[in-house]
């Protein structure tokens, strides 16, 4: 690149000659910079009027050096202020931990920026209309336009954001409304330039209506999301309640069946006791009573058959299998098991199924309750963070 002149400041350098490699001039006390025309390191301002020390916050600034002209310290993202001594708009917390407010604030911030841009655009168009002169045929449209602007201002004021954030928009809307009112006395005297004014008025009217439509869509969408969330929660809980009711009906029916089975069991015990008593009191060793014993034995056999049939019926009712011989899956009396997954007709199996169904329904209710509580807690925390971010943004705006 070749050689470059030193250009050392005569009032701030000791010599006109600079360093041959980096071009740094030899500065006198109280001067700094490459050519000695600025304040020294760690200070800023006009050296002829007096330099000021940099006061960068060590917790918030990237370094202790500041801009030599403005004194602005170099702040990381999320930190602001001349000295980088406070959290920026859209964040909360304490230095150096400035935490972003999150999606809630970001969405509102984008909406506010859009509104600010739209208001500025309407202001420019209104000024152009005033210069070009709108025709008298559009007096009615101007009245409707003023009404739309008033409605827009009402929407903005009712939004859940700080007044400082919307102050510029309100002011611009007021200015635009005032300018439109100033145009009214001149409507009759400006009948020319109809084509140009028609296009501009139509464009202005359309943009303001679109702006109002965006507010309405945003409000409707929020309401729809809240209603949908509530409806889903109610449907889930009602479904779980219906499941419990169904399980209760099944349990009641099975309880009655088990009661009948228990009665049958008591009867079989009575039969067994009677047989044992009968055998103990019978004498089969007497040869003279051979015919009588034979008749008695026949009665015992018939009696035992009846008992066996009764026991098989009880096994089927309780376990789902006859039990004689022992059923491979369902078991039975004296078989070591009773009921199972493949024994759907048994009272024991049905009772277990009903109990499991009730337990699952209970767990479902608890799960939905925990989910609902968690969702409500998140919504409350999000709303709290939005309000906190709005308050901090308002305070930051006042401090700035």
Curated annotation (Swiss-Prot):
Tell me where in this chain the Laminin EGF-like domain is found.
1-5, 6-53, 54-100
Q: Which UniProt keywords apply?
A: Coiled coil, Disulfide bond, Extracellular matrix, Glycoprotein, Laminin EGF-like domain, Repeat, Secreted
**Which tissues is this chain's protein expressed in?**
Individual glial and muscle cells.
Q: Which residues form a coiled coil?
A: 140-235, 353-400
* Positions of the UniProt region annotated as Disordered: 369-400
> Which CDD domains does this one have?
EGF_Lam (cd00055)
Gene3D superfamilies the record matches: Laminin
Q: Does this UniProt record's set of keywords contain Glycoprotein?
A: yes
Which region ranges are annotated with the description Domain II and I?
101-400
A UniProt-annotated Pfam family: EGF_laminin
**Annotated SMART domains:** EGF_Lam
The task this protein performs is described as: Binding to cells via a high affinity receptor, laminin is thought to mediate the attachment, migration and organization of cells into tissues during embryonic development by interacting with other extracellular matrix components.
Quaternary form? Laminin is a complex glycoprotein, consisting of three different polypeptide chains (alpha, beta, gamma), which are bound to each other by disulfide bonds into a cross-shaped molecule comprising one long and three short arms with globules at each end.
Its protein name is: Laminin subunit B
Naturally occurring in which organism (per UniProt)? Hirudo medicinalis
């Amino acid at each position: 690149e070749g050689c470059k002149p030193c250009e050392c400041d005569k009032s701030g350098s000791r010599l006109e000659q600079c360093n041959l490699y980096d071009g740094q001039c030899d500065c006198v006390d109280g001067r700094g910079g490459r050519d000695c025309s600025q304040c020294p390191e760690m200070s800023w301002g006009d050296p002829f009027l007096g330099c000021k020390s940099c006061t960068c916050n060590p917790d918030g600034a990237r370094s202790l050096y500041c801009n030599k002209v403005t004194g602005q310290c170099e702040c990381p993202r999320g930190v602001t202020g001349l000295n980088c001594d406070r959290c920026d708009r859209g964040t909360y917390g304490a230095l150096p931990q400035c935490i972003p407010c999150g999606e809630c604030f970001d969405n509102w911030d984008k909406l506010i920026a859009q509104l600010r841009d739209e208001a500025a655009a309407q202001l420019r168009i209104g000024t152009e209309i005033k210069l070009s002169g709108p025709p008298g045929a559009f007096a009615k449209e101007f009245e409707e336009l003023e009404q739309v602007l008033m409605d827009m201002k009402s929407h903005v004021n009712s939004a859940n954001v700080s007044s400082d954030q919307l102050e510029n928009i309100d002011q611009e809307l007021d200015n635009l409304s005032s300018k439109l009112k100033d145009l009214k006395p001149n409507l009759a005297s400006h009948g020319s330039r109809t084509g140009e004014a028609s296009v501009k008025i139509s464009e202005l009217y359309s943009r303001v209506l679109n702006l109002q439509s965006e507010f309405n869509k945003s409000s409707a969408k929020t309401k729809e999301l809240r209603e949908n969330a509530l409806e889903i929660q109610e449907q889930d809980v009602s479904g779980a309640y219906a499941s419990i009711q169904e399980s209760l009906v099944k349990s009641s029916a099975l309880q009655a069946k088990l009661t009948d089975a228990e009665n049958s069991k008591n009867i079989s015990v009575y039969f067994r006791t009677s047989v044992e008593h009968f055998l103990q009191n019978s004498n089969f060793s007497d040869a003279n009573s051979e015919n009588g014993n034979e008749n008695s034995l026949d009665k015992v056999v018939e009696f035992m058959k009846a008992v066996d049939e009764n026991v098989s019926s009880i096994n089927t009712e309780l376990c789902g299998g006859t039990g004689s011989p022992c059923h491979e899956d369902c078991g039975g009396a004296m078989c070591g098991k009773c009921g199972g997954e493949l024994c759907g007709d048994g009272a024991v199996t049905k009772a277990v199924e009903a109990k499991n169904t009730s337990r699952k329904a209970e767990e479902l209710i608890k799960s939905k309750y925990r989910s609902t509580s968690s969702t409500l807690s998140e919504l409350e925390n999000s709303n709290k963070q939005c309000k906190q971010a709005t308050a901090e943004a308002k305070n930051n705006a006042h401090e700035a």
